[in-house]
Curated annotation (Swiss-Prot):
Signal peptide (UniProt feature, chain positions): none
Full protein name: Uracil-DNA glycosylase
Enzyme category, top tier: hydrolase
Organism whose genome encodes this protein: Streptococcus pneumoniae serotype 2 (strain D39 / NCTC 7466)
PROSITE patterns: U_DNA_GLYCOSYLASE (PS00130)
Reaction(s) this enzyme catalyzes, per UniProt: Hydrolyzes single-stranded DNA or mismatched double-stranded DNA and polynucleotides, releasing free uracil
Keywords in alphabetical order: Cytoplasm, DNA damage, DNA repair, Hydrolase
Amino acid sequence: MEHSSWHALIKAQLPEGYFGKINQFMEQVYSQGIIYPPKEKVFQALLTTLLEEVKVVILGQDPYHGPGQAQGLSFSVPDSIPAPPSLQNILKELSDDIGVKKSHDLTAWAEQGVLLLNACLTVPAGQANGHAGQIWEPFTDAVIQVVNHLDRPVVFVLWGAYARKKKALVTNPHHLIIESAHPSPLSVYRGFWGSKPFSKANTFLKETGQEPIDWLR
């Protein structure tokens, strides 16, 4: 992370010494139990999607907390792992909106400029939201603020009440906010189905002179 295009700009948004606190937190929790994702993948979203490449931000809450699922990209799992219910619903909406994506590993999206960011970057095994409110939110809010300050128009995709609270950080009128219910089975019928976020994002990117995302990769 230290050598990425993100580092200095995120650091400037945070109190002095905050990166050190993050490092201490990670050393502590990874030494005490099973934490997801693997330590080397905690910052995967920022390492895969460089700041100068960001076109779309899809905000999640925290990583999957089952074995082998979390890979540092919101909603994504390796193809060797069955797609969790929310991801199944995302891919179904994509199928209805644009077409069928055969892989449920979303790395190809990240490589095209889709920042797959969780608000909380770590989770204890089996404990959803187990690290919520401890260290990560100021850091990931800073990431959102860095993207907000870009002159280049960006699409922010906010699914569910938690993500939609982050709308307050997106103040730049150049950007597009697409919001709906969360793809979780509990809320998918409250406005996620039929919301067509993928085609809406691509329409905006084309209108602003940018290459659309190949969502089927």
